[in-house]
Amino acid sequence: ADSITTEDNKNFIVHINEDAAWSDGTPITSDDVTYSFLRLASPLVANATLVYGVFEGVDSETGFVEEGATEVSGVTAVDEKTVQFTTKEPMSMITFMSSYAAYFHTMPKHIIENIAEGELTTSDWFNHPDVVSGPYMVTDYDTNHYISYAANENYWKGAPKIGRMNIKILDSSQVYSSLQSGEIDVTSHTMTNIPQEDNDSIEALENVDVVYGSPVTNQSVFIQTKNIPDARVRQALVYAIDRQKIVDDLLKGHGEVIDGFVSSASPYFDDSITPISYDPEKA
């Protein structure tokens, strides 16, 4: 997509880039999006995610459409390059983008429409896709050890400069030794679980440059308001936790305390909000 807009925070208009195309040259259209949604939300696919349940026409409890459904009111094609997503309840743009749009995967309709509905996830294409929309294609993988990629030379934004990538699946105890030996070239806390006790040792490696960027993930506490309806109790939990100490001691100062879902690096960050301070007595 090259733009997402909304006027009421329920109807989100997604415009697909005019140049976007699959690796076989077929244009990516709104039909790909709507058809992919139907297939992924099918009860025969039994997708483990429940994110589809927030959209109109999808069961809120299961996240599925009816078996054999040919359309869903919550995801419709406006024109060849425009799709409208309609949610059951209003949500902010950042919630739609980061919690839903980011996890919806569009597939090539002209490929998957030839695969039986209940056989999608076990099909050869699904597990070894040779028609893709991104810069890389999977060439090989071992679920417990690695996944290998080759550049998509027909990528509509231009072929990647790195021809091949091999993503190793490591146990956290292997990260330090793999960096030390040069077995892996790069990693991050978002790619693998780097033990806190290894941070100083990794920073000391002569063959490794540690680069800290802006925070991109967060740790939050989610509370069932039906079980704890008193807002004062929920507020007390925030006052009782020394979040700055967690940043200073656990994250070595590489983080920030925020009252919200997005970091200061996000264009949706509201810098007018002052985070609640640690105050055990008030709690």
Regions inferred by a protein language model and the residue ranges of each:
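Aromatic- and charge-enriched surface segment that lines or borders ligand/interaction sites
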Residues: D2-L50, V78, Q84, S178
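Surface-exposed binding/hinge segments that line
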Residues: T5, H15, L50-N114
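Short helices/loops that flank or line small-molecule/ion binding pockets
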Residues: G25-P27, D32, S173-T187, A231-Q235
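Alpha-helical secondary-structure segments
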Residues: T29-S36, T82-T86, G134-P135, G163-R164, ...
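Gly/Pro-rich hinge or "lid" segments in bacterial periplasmic/extracellular proteins
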Residues: T86-M91, S98-P160, R164, Q174, ...
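Ligand-site clamp/hinge motif
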Residues: N152-D198, V216
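Ligand-binding "clamshell"
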Residues: Q196-V211
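Structural transition elements
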Residues: V257-A283
